[in-house]
Amino acid sequence: MFLLHFPSALIILVPSHRIAFTMSTDHSARSPRLRACVRCQQRKVRCDHKSPCGNCVASDSQCVPATLTPRRRRFQERVLLDRLRHYEGLLRQHNIYFEPLHPQAKQEPVIADVPRDCERSETARAQTPVQSQAVDLWQAISRVTLEPEDDDGDSPDVQADGVENAWDHHVDQPEANDQTGDDLLFGQPQANVNVLALHPEQAQIFRLWQTYLENVNPLLKVTHTPTLQPRIVDAVSDLGDIHPTLEALMFSIYCIAVMSLADNECHRLLKSSKEDLLARYRLGCRQVLIKCRPWQFTNVDGLTAVYLYLVSVSPQTDPRSLSSMLAAALRIAQRMGLHNESTYTRYTAVEAEMRRRLWWSLVIFDHRMCEMSDYKVTTLTPTWDCRIPLNKPTEALFAVVRSELADLIRHTTFHINFVNPVLAAVAKAKDPGHVSISADGEMLTIQRAIEEKYLAFCDPADPLHFMTIWTTRGYLARNRLLEHYARHLSSPAMQQTDAQRNAALSYALEMLECDTRLRVSPLTCRYRWLVDFHVPALAYIHVLNDLRKRPTESHAGKAWQAMSENYEARAMHPKPSGQGVFTVFARVVLQAWGAREIFLRQRGMPVEAPQIVLDIRSKVGQTSSGSSMVPSCSTGEPSHSSIAISAHSEAIPAQMNFTGHSADGQAFPGPDLGPSSFPDVAGPPGMDIDIDQFWTAMDWRLMHTQAW
């Protein structure tokens, strides 16, 4: 029985079989809708709905009954929203400002079911979305603590700026002047120093500025000449009324410009010695930096001044100390957001580009300092996303190429293994052409990409292009050598073949050859200050170690020639310093040549000492009067017995402690070839790159400061 409800609220009981019969009768009584045939629909005439219809019979055409067209499906809202989210993601990825569809909506974290032992499977971990953008603290606080109607819509940047302004207001108070921490690294300002008197004369200011534009700016590209030069011209007209940040930048330009000159050039251009000029301008730079609170910088000019100042003092500074100072500068840069690409949307194109150049210059300089002190603490890691500078205009070629090469290196497996293997999980292999890089040939792929994208279009007759070509190739060879070490140190059971040893030696020799080209070419005379900063110490270590172990190989003659040529090229511009490190270097060279000389004499072959050996014997003979190490006047070489004595003479001690640094201590990168160079990579006993205690005791960072 069914209850039927009528508007009159009368309830009638009707049998169920009566209801079913009535429904079936009504359904069958409906006649199907008749549609015109296809021909009549096309001609738009009335069809009699027969088969065939009269119109088709009259026109003698085939009558095709029409069928119901499929109903057009409604566009799914989910598909539309997914497509919209995809487009919004692309806009965010390219840092393009837009108004999102749901600005207040936040994706709730997905909580996956986990077992009781709190372990997650690799599949679940891979499916968990990873958030690339860090959560902003001020935005989170405002979301949680404010009601929606109380939120004034201020962005996190505005809120963070409010906090910075509060700190600035605090340190401006007289009672807070002793709590700012400005004296932590640069010390207290000297009251008896007249900074205005430390400025050079107007003519010399423009001469130093021109020197900076010719010697330094083409390589670093951290200042924008069209906008900075008018500011300097205006400042020179009234040195007593300069903004402290601009004044610090000017002093840092003085410092690095003088550092790029030779001593005779300083006398000719500035009428004073290089040492006196550096002491004067560095003092002025420090005083002005203290005045403008360097560790609280929020503008690029101040950070650029710190960077240029640190570069200018690097030749006379312990790399460990300089690395610590750079760590503070990098923290300032991170606070300013230079490492985060998403922060660049609030700046103009020129400002954003200059910030990128400054960040990459800081990172590359820091990496060089870490090579000479502690490789593992480098900032060249895949944990930040600042893009490389653009090669527009092409005058920034050197800075762009070294930035892109550093960007590729920081994602390679061998580099991450040396720095921190944990970062391999977040690293991604990439190259300029977005082609996948195999782990077995990372550096080979990178080298081909750099050669095809940049070096193939360089003009060797152009000084900047010449510098770019050979600096890049030398750096590529160095990293191929490091890749060789990482590959064999990570495989204890795998012994090196002769082909692999020869390949590694070829990388070291290429480093020497590239450095020699940069040293002897007149095209690089303006850039020699940077060439001095990158001594191929790793190449010397590898070549000398290989020659000691394999003195009978056919490549030995080429190796000795390459070392001699590089030695002579660097001796063209010697640096006065002590004899400690040179003495240790001399011992190693004489040991390697002693093994080679024994082989030649046993084979009855003529023994002709290379120039590097002759020069070292001469210098060691001058320091040890009456020693048998003095070369013979007739032949220019000592007897076989005298070589053995000289290699183990008391004049060349077997153990020397070189923990300190000379007055010019930038020099060689720290690592030798032993496992102690890379503590995170265990050196297997069977590895054929072992170094004895003598090699471990030597501090190779100081070697280039000697007069050799």
UniProtKB/Swiss-Prot annotation:
PROSITE patterns noted in UniProt: ZN2_CY6_FUNGAL_2 (PS50048)
> What is the protein's given name?
Transcriptional regulator nsrM
Q: Which domain of life is it from?
A: Eukaryota
Give a short account of what the protein does.
Transcriptional regulator; part of the gene cluster that mediates the biosynthesis of the tetrahydroxanthone dimer neosartorin, which exhibits antibacterial activity.
GO molecular function annotation? DNA binding; DNA-binding transcription factor activity, RNA polymerase II-specific; zinc ion binding
Q: Does the keyword DNA damage apply?
A: no
Per UniProt, which keywords does this protein have? DNA-binding, Metal-binding, Nucleus, Transcription, Transcription regulation, Zinc
Q: PANTHER family attached here?
A: UNCHARACTERIZED TRANSCRIPTIONAL REGULATORY PROTEIN, ZN(II)2CYS6 TRANSCRIPTION FACTOR (EUROFUNG)
